[in-house]
């Protein structure tokens, strides 16, 4: 289990590094830059040059990339060119939903995966084991978006157990908010739980 978690952490770090490089390179090759976005395509060259210097866009690309990464590590995500406010403020405004959703999905992942993996390992090659492995294989194979749509169709549209209208807000009540996060959390949790359950089973059988 520790090897799996360490591998997941290293994979996450590598993915973040690669994603940051790809995003930076895409922004580099796109026509125009933030200065032109702010001032418009008809802005005077001297005005553009002054704004580029103010924003640090006149520095070499490698310097700008490392300044961007170091700023993020210190919590400085820069200024949103669209909203004209620090990006960190926009993140804080939305983390009130994203963070609880992530925690909820993680909790469901562990609650589902650990018992499933333990039961499958303890009943190796039985019908129970084969059933659990079959379900987890389905959980790995089915795309998340299709699974999420199916959950909404069954539990919100057909059975009316949940709302399909989005997150109601924490001001409507804690449990109503949790109810609004349940379907998205399940959609996020089941694919990860399927992977973790299979890893758990293999790890237990190897010991």
Regions found by a protein language model. Name each.
Residues 3, 40, 50-53, 67-71, ...:
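Short amphipathic alpha-helical coupling elements at transmembrane boundaries
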Residues 15-66, 159-180:
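Hydrophobic alpha-helical transmembrane segments of membrane transport/permease proteins
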Residues 1, 57, 61, 65, ...:
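Juxtamembrane loop-helix boundary motifs flanking transmembrane segments in multi-pass membrane proteins
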Residues 58-114:
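An internal, D/E-rich "acidic patch" concept
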Residues 2-4, 13-16, 92-129, 144, ...:
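Alpha-helical transmembrane segments of integral membrane proteins
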Residues 23, 27, 31, 35, ...:
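Membrane-water interface at transmembrane helix exits
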Residues 22-29, 59, 67-70, 134-165, ...:
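Membrane-water interface segments at the C-terminal ends of transmembrane alpha-helices
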């Amino acid at each position: 289990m520790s090897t799996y978690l360490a591998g997941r952490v290293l994979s996450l770090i590598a993915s973040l590094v690669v994603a940051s490089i790809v995003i930076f390179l895409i922004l580099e090759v796109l026509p125009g830059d933030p200065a032109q976005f702010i001032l418009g395509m008809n802005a005077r060259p001297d005005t553009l040059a002054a704004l580029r210097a103010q924003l640090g866009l006149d520095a070499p690309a490698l310097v700008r990339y490392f300044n961007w990464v170091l700023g993020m590590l210190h919590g400085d995500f820069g200024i949103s060119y669209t909203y004209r406010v620090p990006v960190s403020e926009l993140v804080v405004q939305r983390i009130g939903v994203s963070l609880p959703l992530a925690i909820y999905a993680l909790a469901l992942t562990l609650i589902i995966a650990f018992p499933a993996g333990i039961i499958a390992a303890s009943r190796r090659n039985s019908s129970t084991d084969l059933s659990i492995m079959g379900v987890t294989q389905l959980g790995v194979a089915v795309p998340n978006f299709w699974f999420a749509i199916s959950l909404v169709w069954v539990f919100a549209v057909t059975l009316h157990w949940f709302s399909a209208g989005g997150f109601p807000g924490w001001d409507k009540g804690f449990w109503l908010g949790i109810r609004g996060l349940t379907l998205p959390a399940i959609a996020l949790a089941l694919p990860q739980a399927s992977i973790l359950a299979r890893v758990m089973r293999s790890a237990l059988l190897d010991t």
